[in-house]
Amino acid sequence: MTGASLALTAAVVAHAYYLKNQFYPTVVYLTKSSPSMAVLYIQAFVLVFLLGKFMGKVFFGQLRAAEMEHLLERSWYAVTETCLAFTVFRDDFSPRFVALFTLLLFLKCFHWLAEDRVDFMERSPNISWLFHFRILALMLLLGVLDAFFVSHAYHSLVIRGASVQLVFGFEYAILMTVILTVFIKYILHSVDLQSENPWDNKAVYMLYTELFTGFIKVLLYVAFMTIMVKVHTFPLFAIRPMYLAMRQFKKAVTDAIMSRRAIRNMNTLYPDATAEELQAMDNVCIICREEMVTGAKRLPCNHIFHTSCLRSWFQRQQTCPTCRMDVLRASLPTQPQTPTEQQNQHQNQAQQQPTPVIPPQPNFPPGILPPFPPGMFPLWPPMGPFPPVPGAPGGNPPDEANPGSSSGSSPRPGETSNVGSESQPGAALPGFPFPPPFLGMPILPPFGLPPMPMPPAGFTGLTDEELRAMEGHERQNLEARLQCLQNIHTLLDAAMLQINQYLTVLASIGPPQPPISSTSTSTSSAASASTAPTTSNISEPVIPVDTTSTVTNTESSQQSAPPAPVSVETLSGAEGGETTTEEPDNVELRRRRLQKLETGTTDSQ
């Protein structure tokens, strides 16, 4: 690209000189021709790029990948802000204006590279004299250029009034604060490298340096915005750098306050680690990678570090270096227990814990509940008796439930009443008033789940180290245990909810009708249905009490002599004296029922 731009520039200049044949007319032609100026601009940018690479080789040598990445990332934003500045100062747009902005962007790039290279000193163990010479020479050159351009902008504003030099003056003033921060950091890193032991107060000085320079940047941007709004227009290109400066200053203030609080808590709340605690665990500080002998602090999460390392760490962030626990929100640490104390405590708890009293299981009829596999719900308490079903018949004998039949007439001689001897299906099952539903259906296990797996036999074959590795003391282990307990609690709640729904449905369906086993059962059911029409789904007319008594006596006579066939004419003749006084509809209804009972008796025989 360099050769192409050079050849294109030479061709444009030669063409202009060929047309004008003199130097001055050639220069005028090149400045007035837009294509020629575009080619010259491209050539100027190429020359600036070559100059930047040359100065980078001189002051930095080989750039690292992180430095190149930061440079490209910041350059895109700087170019965008420069284009926005061109739109704000479009009346002052000229080759000189473009050259000044190009020079400003060029110097900004070297300020960014100097800042990254000085930060690299903290992570590099070996710093050569050539490195110091390059950094000092670069900082001196950049400082002189910044001061010169600030002075030039000031004199231009004093002599010519408000112009585009106002922007350049504030930009170079901001760059002066950047180079001041870089110089102070360089001094602090150099002092730290000269000392044999790590310098504990370096982080404090760096924090207050960033706080001071950040405050100066915020003041400069606020003053620049105020002056630009009053003199020219709203500086849209300064919004992003002003926001970044304010955010950096706010972060520095917050870090200063939180670090002082964390260091105060470390000095007052956190206990010193004892020699036994250091021997019982890995005594290597993960911050400095050196062994801890004395001067170590134990955090609330029971992690131990050097006091000086913690002080430097808390200047940057207020979390545990190992588990990232917020030390400002943690409670007062508790003394860790030795394995012997933990074993004694577990034994005492096991002795003091009373034996749980298991209440007796309710007497449920077989088949009313599906057979639960053993061990499926080991944590459930024993279930109590089921709630009574509203409207379900109890264990009372039928003569109490139907007083009309007993008071209306007395049994005849020779007849044995079977009403009192009849037994309801639910009366023989204490604790549950009705038989199990769905007698013909196979009973499935609840929810279709297989039985729970049996717990492991024991951990006798594992060593202490393996048990500690399985238990875990880090944050992710505790979170995994809590999540497992929450899952178990959720599954138990869901299972209990489904069981309650099952019991509710079971109680709401009511007792099913028992199967017809004998003539007496069928006759009693028909008599009960005729005396209690409210329990039937079909509305029927009410039959008087005397009629019911007659039917009951007739049924008793039928039960006492089963071989003799029962006919409608016999029963009708026995009741012939009473039918004359009843209505024709009731007589017809009774006749049909007796005919139905006769048919049922014949089928059962």
Curated annotation (Swiss-Prot):
GO molecular function: ubiquitin protein ligase activity; zinc ion binding
EC number, UniProt record: 2.3.2.27
GO annotation (BP), single: ubiquitin-dependent protein catabolic process
Membrane topology listed for this record: Multi-pass membrane protein
SUPFAM superfamilies: RING/U-box
Record field: compositional bias (Polar residues): 415-424, 546-555
Cytoplasmic face of the membrane: 57-92, 151-163, 240-605
Binding site for Zn(2+) 2: 301, 303, 320, 323
Positions in the Lumenal compartment: 20-35, 114-129, 185-218
Function: E3 ubiquitin-protein ligase which accepts ubiquitin specifically from endoplasmic reticulum-associated UBC7 E2 ligase and transfers it to substrates, promoting their degradation. Component of the endoplasmic reticulum quality control (ERQC) system also called ER-associated degradation (ERAD) involved in ubiquitin-dependent degradation of misfolded endoplasmic reticulum proteins. Also promotes the degradation of normal but naturally short-lived proteins. Protects cells from ER stress-induced apoptosis.
Assembly notes: Homodimer.
Name used for this protein in its record: E3 ubiquitin-protein ligase synoviolin A
Lineage: Eukaryota, Metazoa, Chordata, Craniata, Vertebrata
